[in-house]
Amino acid sequence: DICGVQPMTGPTGLIFAMRSTKGTNRDINNSAVETFFNEVDTEHSSENSADGLASNDQTGSNPGLLADGASNYTIGGQGMTTAQSEALGDGSSNHFNEMGFSIEKVTVTAKSRALKAEYSLELAQDLKAVHGLDAESELANILSTEVLAEINREVVRTVYKIARPGAQNNTATAGVFDLDVDSNGRWSVEKFKGLLFQIERDMNAIGHETRRGKGNILICSADVASALSMAGVLDYTPALAGNSNLLPDDNSSTLAGTLNGRIKVYVDPYSANVSDNHFYVAGYKGSSAYDAGLFYCPYVPLQMVRAVGQDTFQPKIGFKTRYGMVLNPFAKGLTAL
């Protein structure tokens, strides 16, 4: 639910990413600048390769800082004249500017998990006679549940580890949203709505920095989910449609509900809930299995193996699985986990 799934067909695999660049595909030094990620430079197609024409680099990224007469936000390239366009390519210093692409890869290698259990025939006989339970089935359930739970926690902890700090602007302390300071509400419901606004800001930041889409998943502690729920319940004219559908419970489903009809909220049942400080992690997962920041790559599904001790003739069972885990190449550079 919180990461993409790309099955592996062998013990090692490759994840490819294509980047559009300014420059030529023959650039072996890989110094070409990526484009289509943030705002395009209006100068590139209005200049020759030597940047010898009259257009200037655009400056500034926040129109909100634009002031009359200020030069902190400029247009940049505004096109060539007809004469300049006709002259392109007529000399060694007057070539067309070029575009290209690069194919980059990240290697993912399968890793393994394994557990075993042994039991005596006498134990199996007594367990069946007294409790009506099958020893092999019970141990198999224990082993498989443990392995799958460990993989699940590895995924969640990996998400926490690779997540970038949020709340970087308009907060007293960068990375911390203080309900008493940053929200500045008169009562709890207003402070909780301030928290919701900060969550939306972090969701917007994901869309701005990744250019994939606005954040749509939230992992948080039960108290944070309860605060979001109460923000809608306590308000007599709720503007937060859908918040009353949040049902945070550490001991039931980790999916608490949907926030604003769009954001799926998951509760981490193992976070330190009885604490002065709480957390949330905002993320994005697209409709495609390839549109995520983290990929779980199953290779060999959980397999059960039976054996009998060569000396004791007592039964043994074991479980093994193999899988990989890797970041999206666009998420944090070309770094495999």
Residue map of PLM features:
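Short, glycine/acidic-rich hinge or "gate" loops at secondary-structure transitions
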Residues: 7, 135-136, 151-173
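Eukaryote-specific, cytoplasm-facing alpha-helical/coiled-coil scaffolding segments in long proteins
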Residues: 13, 20, 165-175, 244-250
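Intrinsically disordered, low-complexity regulatory segments in eukaryotic proteins
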Residues: 1-9
